[in-house]
């Protein structure tokens, strides 16, 4: 690293009225460095970066570029300093071409005429440098999210940016797209660019970052070099308590009777003769690689997918579940893995989202009982500690953690016998994860049978009483404590023990 930092933010404070969002924050970034910025939602990460990008002005503090004070009062000042910020929500015009987006606001012209051919040529040169597959003449609306992200990066390169800020860039990307993005980020770093990478995903931070800085409650907590990265220390820095305290699972919860019994359930495609059981008060983990059939199994149980064979029993009673409505009537709740596309009604109020699954139950002659709906939503908001100013706030405006708790509260409201959670903490920060784990443990204590699908192995190990592992549509094995380890789960998930897999169905 160079001795003189490319960027220094010193003693940055920012107040919104009486609320102080940042309290004397420091941040130092060098050329050729990937600098991760971590912290819970509300820690001040986005506010700090918006100050750097000129979207906000500081209340006090100073910014230095290569050791020289630099006044950033607006976006133009940031661009002149070589700073570009890629927001989580893309800042592109979908009806314009890639080239038109790259040059938007700075179009090439000669004699009053826009030089479109030259703009396309220059844009294509940047696209080729990135190794992207789209063309400069393509409309942005026809590109994937990953490609739109590349357009944002291309725009930063076109502007000769030296500092690139990326806010949760993998939130909407597939595993393959994420891998390609990482390759590009590493290449840009090797070319000398400084990259500030905002993320709550530790796996990404471990893979990419040269250094990590942590904010908590609007204050700078500290930084760790790559060689010193430690999950326990990062969690402690972010939430003020060690990783061992993150999981709230109580091992001494007495298990009740057999609540859910699945026998040889099949859909003829993704799920092949799966058998599993969950008892009242038990949290059972369902692990496996992407494409193993875990989500499809959950959809079969909830009636989203049609089963071609096998049986489902609840409390010893055989059932045929044709639809989610029937599943809800039988006391099954299902938290989907994609809350924005498959779970939440983003434009509706928090109250409407909470009571969505109880409308039929609580309606009187087809009319909504608004007083009862308000009571249900208020109780859920208090019980799950959902941070909203009031029950009528729009769901789409909430943080990821509060959106997830909002969805969980929908199923808490039906007083479920069985709760299926598909990636319950995906896209939420460490603090929200801890609260979700607390909610899960509380529901288990109340006798709910919980089937938890998760790709986060520490979560599976920390929260599960037992674990089933799927491989290529089948159960590859079942693990009990103390054999529930990440190594054993991955061995089963990758099919290494396929010839010696354990018998997991109990007659």
From Swiss-Prot:
Query: Which stretches make up the ABC transporter domain?
Result: 7-242, 253-497
Which residue ranges traverse the bilayer? Answer: none
The keyword Membrane is assigned to this record: yes
Q: Which Gene3D superfamilies match?
A: P-loop containing nucleotide triphosphate hydrolases
**EC number(s) stated in the UniProt entry for this protein:** 7.5.2.7
The protein's annotated catalytic reaction(s) are: D-ribose(out) + ATP + H2O = D-ribose(in) + ADP + phosphate + H(+)
Q: Family, per the entry?
A: Belongs to the ABC transporter superfamily. Ribose importer (TC 3.A.1.2.1) family.
The name this protein goes by in its record: Ribose import ATP-binding protein RbsA
Q: Which organism is it from?
A: Yersinia pestis
């Amino acid at each position: 690293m160079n001795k003189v930092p490319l960027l220094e933010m010193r003693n940055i404070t920012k107040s919104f009225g009486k609320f102080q969002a940042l309290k004397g924050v420091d941040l130092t970034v060098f050329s050729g460095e990937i600098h991760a910025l971590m912290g819970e939602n509300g820690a001040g990460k986005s506010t700090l970066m918006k100050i750097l990008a000129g979207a906000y002005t500081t209340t006090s503090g100073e910014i230095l570029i290569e050791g020289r004070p630099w006044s950033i009062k607006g976006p133009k000042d940031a661009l002149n300093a070589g700073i570009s910020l890629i927001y989580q929500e893309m800042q592109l015009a979908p009806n314009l071409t890639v080239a038109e987006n790259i040059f938007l606001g700075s179009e090439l012209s000669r004699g009053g005429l826009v030089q479109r051919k030259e703009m396309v040529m220059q844009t294509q040169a940047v696209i080729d440098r990135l190794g992207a597959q789209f063309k400069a003449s393509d409309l942005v609306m026809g590109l994937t999210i990953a490609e739109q992200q590349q357009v944002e990066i291309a725009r930063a390169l076109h502007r000769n940016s030296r500092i690139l800020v990326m806010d949760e860039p993998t939130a909407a990307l597939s595993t393959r797209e994420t891998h390609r993005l990482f390759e590009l980020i590493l290449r840009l770093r090797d070319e000398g660019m400084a990259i500030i990478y905002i993320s709550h995903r530790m796996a990404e931070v471990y893979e990419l970052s040269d250094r990590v800085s942590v904010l908590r409650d609007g204050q700078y907590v500290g930084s760790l070099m790559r060689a010193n990265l430690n999950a326990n220390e990062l969690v402690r820095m972010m939430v003020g308590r060690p990783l061992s305290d993150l999981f709230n699972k109580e091992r001494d919860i007495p298990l009740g009777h057999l609540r859910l019994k699945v026998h040889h359930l099949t859909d003829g495609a993704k799920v092949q003769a799966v058998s599993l059981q969950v008892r009242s008060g038990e949290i059972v983990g369902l692990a496996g690689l992407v494409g193993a059939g875990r989500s499809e199994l959950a959809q079969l149980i909830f009636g989203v997918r049609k089963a071609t064979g096998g049986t489902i029993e609840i409390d010893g009673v055989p059932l045929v579940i044709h639809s989610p409505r029937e599943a809800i009537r039988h006391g099954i709740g299902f938290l989907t893995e994609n809350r924005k596309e498959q779970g939440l009604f983003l434009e509706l109020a928090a109250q409407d989202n909470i009571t969505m699954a109880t409308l039929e139950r609580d309606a009187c002659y087809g009319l909504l009982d608004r007083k009862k709906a308000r009571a249900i939503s208020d109780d859920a908001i208090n019980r799950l500690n959902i941070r909203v100013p009031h029950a009528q706030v729009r769901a789409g405006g909430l943080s990821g953690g509060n959106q997830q708790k909002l969805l969980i509260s929908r199923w808490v409201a039906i007083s479920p016998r069985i709760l299926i959670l598909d990636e319950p903490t995906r896209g939420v920060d460490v603090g929200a994860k801890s609260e979700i784990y607390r909610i899960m443990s509380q529901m288990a204590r109340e006798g709910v049978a919980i089937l938890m699908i998760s790709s986060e192995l520490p979560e599976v190990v920390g929260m599960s009483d037992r674990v089933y592992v799927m491989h290529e549509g089948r159960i590859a094995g079942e693990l009990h404590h103390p054999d529930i380890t990440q190594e054993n789960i991955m061995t089963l998930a990758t099919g290494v023990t396929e010839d010696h897999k354990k018998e997991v169905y109990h007659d």
